[in-house]
């Protein structure tokens, strides 16, 4: 038995209860239309008691279905056309909303059916002990997180709110008329709702309903504007903003507070002495109670300016004035304009003392609260003085201050610091990674003492594989232990414990990660857990850099010890969730050949049950395999990559090959690569199934020479595969998008090896791209050439040759390869004029080239019809040049503008 089959057998034994589809004889090749219909897992949930699991399966186009399973893996129920799904707090019910069928909706749209005549959603309340209730004509619903109650509205024109227990005991159902908004408290069955009232019984205003007692309380009467209605965690206190005059809310919002279900009282309003002069309560500022509910945080702002209604808009010039020395690029200002108009500055109301303290302002606008708002000090910061340099650095410096929540007094901690300060859970320390020296630091919030936790000589905190002309990033942190006693920091492989006061030596808690080249990372199973309990066993996920496989490990981090392997192998583990009250978990396991089906187990992973059977979708189709390969680059570096071979691979045959890549992807060897009509890349399964080999090589870069780095890494990898004898060297294509699109465009100027290239959203002119704008954020593009992905390490005037040598445009006359470009006119990442420069140059040179522009789409197609179209055209393009299939009409004759609304040219 060869090693390929040994590995496959080991995988099957590891996974356990697998469907035998992989052993079945498949005969059909995938089509693009098949990709659209194949289902993926788009959601999953486990009940708090660990007895039930729900999983949502969804095609890329069409209706989703939610399946319900018990602890033995038996499918109990199926809910077609499913959307949202939630288990109740008691684990006795599953609540599922259902949408109308897509085919029905589409047919009604074709008939131009009016909106009020279109079908509505439904709500299914399914009892896990048997029985179900269906609520038709659903408009919206909320399920209480900590109580078995649901609130909903139904009917397009009816705004009645219905609140009922999930047991369908309608004798305890409540109704409220003309409801505008409603929600449950996070950890109780308390519900608020805002109603316009009716003439009979219900006055307009804000009400509180205690579902446990049935008591309804009018918290605030009024038909004005209610905003930011917020419970504390337990639902005992309720805060909100209110404005009686709807047309003056921008300046007349007031803050109200209800305690223990009592009618609300106004606690802050315009003109409060604690506010800066001319400031008001912001309707956009988020309300937030501290954990103890002793503090209420809210937002203030300068009174918003109002437009001059006496001046006609047509009489006002619509000019933008860009200034060379303004800190924030005008395009960024314009992009963020609506956000800035809604900006608020945090203040706090001390509930017990009835005092207000303004914490943030226009000079120091960013704030971090410690201990969920209960710490005595918060962290204030601003990057405004340094915004200009971030335009080309890609990073920003900040000033940091402590601020007292009692009196608002401030103390400077650091100026012009590149570190991104964060707060420990209880707010005792600020901590950060300093990119400039690759070290971790803490700072005591109480006395301002700064401590250096790591040095480059003692701890490799940084990304050891950094290959951009900038400071390397950190590997991050696992979190803080209880009482802020220790900070757990990752290096490339292990988890280390550090004393935040730097009085004790650091401890490598996992010990063997670097030795075994396994990268250990803590798995957070409890979303509500703020700190790490070192005395409890912890689940770690490990990535093996040698095999590229994953594993789960058990560790007690109270002492240094090698983690205990629970399961590990040649697969990828993802999407783990734990039941709240038991040690049951659900997770997915996958490889390129193995669908990421959902599994159910306990935390020891001794027995795992496969719940879903998504792999059954593969049984009729030819499915490829993935293999790790290695070679030496032209500049002497060992590289890895993945070769994806057809299911019926025969080493004696010659296969067409597509090289598809970005930067480094060998670590995704066991990624299933869910079949789909991708927005930017080929679908590996589609091409494997149709007789293509796909090669995804790792690229490692030298500063200043990204194009040549790509050439030096990729070409010997391709040569290595050609040398194996099964590649048709006259039928090799290349495909990449964005950064990958740039690289394949560059390669076409350096070699005529490729018979066809698809280049998506490429940069071909580094000079003009440097001066462009990322319209999706307003940012200038200069930083990415000087410091990040484009890797030129200088400006066009300091290193002009680098810009020239790395720009495909200036050697386009050397291109001998037909090119398909995809670049959309609403691209917010790469200016689409780059695609135009590429196309115009190729057209001028008389070289075969086609360009796809999905009008109104961003960096890649997002509309499903456009993604399908892109995949079909790219598939036809490669099939023509690599498999000698007939040229489709859109390539041979084009699609003239006057024909475009009617013809696709397939």
Map each language-model feature to its residues.
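Bacterial Sec-dependent N-terminal signal peptides
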Residues: 1-27, 763, 772
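Beta-propeller folds
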Residues: 16, 23-584, 590-596, 600-601, ...
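Composition- and surface-driven signal marking solvent-exposed, interaction-prone regions
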Residues: 221-222, 310-311, 359-362, 393, ...
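Conserved acidic residues
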Residues: 294, 656, 755
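Hydrophobic/aromatic beta-strand patches that form the interior of the parallel beta-sheet core
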Residues: 357, 379, 599, 629, ...
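Glycine-rich His-Gly loop
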Residues: 383, 543, 590, 660-664, ...
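Cap/lid segment of the alpha/beta-hydrolase catalytic domain
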Residues: 456-468, 605, 613-731, 735-737
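Active-site-proximal cap/loop segments of hydrolase catalytic domains
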Residues: 674-906
């Amino acid at each position: 038995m060869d090693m390929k089959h040994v590995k496959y057998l080991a995988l099957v034994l590891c996974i356990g209860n697998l469907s035998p589809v992989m052993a079945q004889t498949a005969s059909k090749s995938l089509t693009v239309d098949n990709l659209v219909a194949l289902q993926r897992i788009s959601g999953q949930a486990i009940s708090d008691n660990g007895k039930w699991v729900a999983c949502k399966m969804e095609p890329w186009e069409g209706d989703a279905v939610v399946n319900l399973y018990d602890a033995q893996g038996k499918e109990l129920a199926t809910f077609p056309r499913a959307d949202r799904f939630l288990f109740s707090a008691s684990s006795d019910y599953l609540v599922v909303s259902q949408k109308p069928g897509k085919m029905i909706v589409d047919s009604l749209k074709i008939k131009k059916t009016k909106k009020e005549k279109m079908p509505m959603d439904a709500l299914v309340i399914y009892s896990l002990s048997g029985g179900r209730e269906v609520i038709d004509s659903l408009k919206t619903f909320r399920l209480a997180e900590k109580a078995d109650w649901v609130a909903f509205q139904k009917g397009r024109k009816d705004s009645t709110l219905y609140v009922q227990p999930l047991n369908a005991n309608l004798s305890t159902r409540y109704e409220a008329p003309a409801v505008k908004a409603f929600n449950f408290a996070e950890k109780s069955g308390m519900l608020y709702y805002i109603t316009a009232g009716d003439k009979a019984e219900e006055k307009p205003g804000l009400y509180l309903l205690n579902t446990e007692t049935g008591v309804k309380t009018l918290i605030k009467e009024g038909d004005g504007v209610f905003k930011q209605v917020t419970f504390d965690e337990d639902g005992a206190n309720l805060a909100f903003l209110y404005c009686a005059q709807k047309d003056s809310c921008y300046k007349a919002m007031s803050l109200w507070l209800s305690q223990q279900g009592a009618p609300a009282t106004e606690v802050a309003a315009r003109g409060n002495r604690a506010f800066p002069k001319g400031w008001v309560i912001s309707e956009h500022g988020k309300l937030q109670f501290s954990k103890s509910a002793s503090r209420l945080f809210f937002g203030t702002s300068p009174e918003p300016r109002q437009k001059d209604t006496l001046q006609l808009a047509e009489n006002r010039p619509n000019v933008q004035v860009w200034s060379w020395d303004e800190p924030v690029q005008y395009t960024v200002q314009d992009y963020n304009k609506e956000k800035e108009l809604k900006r608020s500055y945090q203040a706090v109301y001390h509930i017990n003392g009835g005092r207000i303290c303004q914490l943030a302002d226009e000079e120091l606008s960013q704030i971090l609260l410690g201990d969920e708002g209960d710490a005595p000090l918060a962290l204030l910061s601003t990057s405004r003085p340094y915004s200009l340099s971030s335009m080309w650095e890609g990073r920003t410096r900040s000033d940091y201050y402590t601020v007292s929540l009692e009196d608002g007094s401030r103390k400077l901690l650091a100026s012009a610091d590149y570190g991104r300060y964060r707060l420990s859970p209880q707010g005792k320390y600020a901590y950060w990674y300093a990119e400039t020296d690759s070290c971790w630091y803490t700072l005591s919030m109480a006395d301002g003492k700064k401590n250096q936790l790591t040095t480059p000589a003692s701890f490799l905190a940084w990304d050891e594989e950094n290959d951009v002309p900038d400071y390397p990033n950190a590997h991050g942190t696992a979190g803080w232990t209880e009482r802020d006693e220790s900070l757990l920091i990752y290096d490339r492989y292990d988890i280390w414990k550090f004393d935040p006061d730097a009085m004790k030596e650091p401890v490598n808690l996992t010990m063997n990660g670097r030795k075994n080249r396994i990268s250990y990372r803590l798995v957070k199973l409890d979303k509500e857990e703020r700190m790490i309990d070192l005395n409890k066993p912890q689940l770690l996920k490990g990535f093996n850099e040698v095999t590229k496989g994953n594993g789960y490990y058990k560790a007690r981090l109270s002492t240094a010890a090698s983690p205990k392997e629970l399961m590990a192998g040649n697969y990828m583990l993802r999407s783990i969730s734990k039941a709240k009250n038991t040690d049951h978990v659900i997770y997915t396991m996958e490889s390129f050949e193995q669908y990421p089906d959902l599994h159910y187990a306990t935390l020891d992973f001794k027995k795992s049950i496969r719940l879903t059977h998504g792999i059954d979708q593969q049984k009729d189709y030819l499915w490829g395999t993935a293999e790790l390969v290695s070679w030496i680059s032209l500049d002497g570096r060992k590289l890895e990559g993945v070769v994806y071979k057809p299911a019926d691979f025969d080493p004696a045959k010659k296969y067409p090959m597509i090289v598809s890549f970005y930067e480094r992807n060998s670590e995704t060897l066991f990624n299933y690569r869910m079949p789909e009509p991708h927005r930017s890349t080929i679908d590996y399964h589609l091409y494997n199934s149709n007789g293509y080999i796909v090669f995804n090589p790792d690229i490692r870069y030298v500063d200043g020479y990204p194009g040549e780095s790509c050439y030096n890494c990729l070409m010997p990898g391709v040569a290595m595969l050609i040398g194996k004898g099964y590649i048709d060297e006259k039928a090799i294509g290349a495909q990449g998008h964005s950064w990958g699109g740039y690289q394949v465009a560059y390669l076409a100027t350096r070699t005529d090896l490729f018979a066809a290239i698809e280049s998506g959203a490429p940069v071909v002119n580094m000079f003009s791209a440097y001066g462009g704008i990322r319209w999706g954020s307003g940012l200038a593009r200069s930083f990415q050439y000087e410091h990040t992905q484009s890797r030129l390490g200088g400006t066009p005037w300091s290193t002009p040759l680098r810009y020239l040598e790395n720009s495909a445009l200036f050697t386009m006359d050397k291109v001998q390869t037909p090119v398909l470009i995809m670049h959309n006119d609403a691209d917010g990442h790469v200016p689409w004029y780059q695609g135009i420069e590429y196309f115009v140059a190729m057209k001028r040179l008389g070289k075969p080239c086609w360009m796809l522009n999905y009008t109104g789409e961003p960096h890649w197609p997002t509309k499903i019809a456009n993604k399908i179209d892109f995949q079909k055209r790219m598939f036809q393009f490669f099939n023509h040049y690599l498999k000698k299939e007939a040229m489709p009409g859109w390539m041979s004759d084009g699609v003239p503008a006057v024909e475009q609304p009617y013809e696709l040219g397939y």
